[in-house]
Amino acid sequence: MPNYNIAKTGKQTQAVKLLKDNKTVCLFGGSRSGKTFIALFAVVLRAINYIGTRHLVIRFRFSHAKQSICYDSMPDVLKVLKADTRVKLNKSDWFYEFPNGSTIWIGGLDDKERTEKILGNEFASIFLNEASQVSYDSHEMLTTRLNPPVGIKPLYIIDYNPPGKTHWGYSIFELRKFPDGRPVPEGDYARLKMNPHDNRENLSNDYIEGTLANLSAAKRKRFLDGDYGDDIGTLWRREWIRYQRQPDDLQRVVVGVDPTGSAGGDECGIVVSASDGVEYYVLDDYSLHGTPSEWAQAV
């Protein structure tokens, strides 16, 4: 059996323990802090140790997944594990094939046809990379595909540079509440903050003081300090929102649509709201990344 005890930072060692002990783990923090590397390390080890299993690494955009995972982080992980000559990347269907029959699939949620094909399968591990770009609906959909063979612990990993406090990740891992108000189960949904200072030994001498320290205050907070943003400029504050049952005497129900106008394809906001004449209620949120025809179908 090869020796897979690679050199890790202190925070990466903590991350490995969390990944062993929990089903769902969020690794969050500043830029270049070693989050993605250690998450991929865990997924690759599981592919090696659990013969013939299937695993998924996915981002919002498939092109970004190919660039950041296949051409950047994954080669480094396979090299330190001395598996780079034994694990093959299939560039037709974009999956890594291991000698023991295990596979790691690479996906992007923006590629609808490919995503549907991939998500027709079930996985022993799922790594949602840069989850700050991903909707809660997509996250929930991914969790339904986490179903390993009997006897293998499922593992769902999320990582991101912390987004604003309105993001579902803040609600789940910091407030310990799902977006619909249900409490998060005790004993799972672990989180670990990993910042550039924790990974200093693997960074260039000038990266922290010369690059990150000179960012604007908001970007320093996110990419250097690894803190969630305050969503300055938003219409609503999280503390204004209360979760409760829908009343029976609603007087008016409205479907609001806010199409995206950006070239980058931001989410189209689609919300069902109502009023009983005194208070206002959000009944459902169908916001999505998609084409105008997909917006229309959702409405």
Predicted feature locations:
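Pre-P-loop entry segment of helicase/translocase ATPase cores
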Residues: 1-24, 258
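Walker A/P-loop NTP-binding motif
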Residues: 36-50
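Conserved RecA-like ASCE P-loop NTPase motor core of nucleic-acid helicases/translocases
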Residues: 53-65
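Inter-Walker segment of RecA-like/P-loop motor cores
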Residues: 66, 70-124
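Walker B catalytic acidic pair
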Residues: 129-130, 259
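ASCE P-loop NTPase helicase motor core
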Residues: 133-202, 207-210
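ATPase catalytic-site recognition across NTP-hydrolyzing enzymes
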Residues: 200-257
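Nucleic-acid-processing active sites and adjacent nucleic-acid-binding tracks
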Residues: 264, 271-299
